[in-house]
């Protein structure tokens, strides 16, 4: 859930997601 559930956010956090 959270950021990793949102493509735009996940794309900016690939190191975490």
From Swiss-Prot:
PTM notes: C-terminal amidation, in synergy with sulfation, is important for activity and structure stability. Non-amidated conotoxins has a 1.9-fold lower inhibitory potency on alpha-3-beta-2/CHRNA3-CHRNB2 nAChRs (IC(50)=0.54 nM), and a 4.8-fold lower inhibitory potency on alpha-7/CHRNA7 nAChRs (IC(50)=367 nM), when compared to sulfated conotoxin.
Molecular function (Gene Ontology), one example: toxin activity
InterPro entries tied to this protein: Conotoxin_a-typ_CS (IPR018072)
Cellular localisation: Secreted
Tissue-specific expression: Expressed by the venom duct.
Record-listed Cysteine amide modification sites: 17
Keywords: Acetylcholine receptor inhibiting toxin, Amidation, Disulfide bond, Ion channel impairing toxin, Neurotoxin, Postsynaptic neurotoxin, Secreted, Sulfation, Toxin
PROSITE patterns hit by this protein: ALPHA_CONOTOXIN
Residue numbers of Sulfotyrosine PTMs: 16
Gene Ontology CC: one annotated term: host cell postsynaptic membrane
SS bond partners: 3-9, 4-17
Keyword flag Cytoplasm: no
Region described as Ser-Xaa-Pro motif, crucial for potent interaction with nAChR: spans on this chain: 5-7
Domain notes: The cysteine framework is I (CC-C-C). Alpha4/7 pattern.
Annotated protein name in UniProt: Alpha-conotoxin AnIB
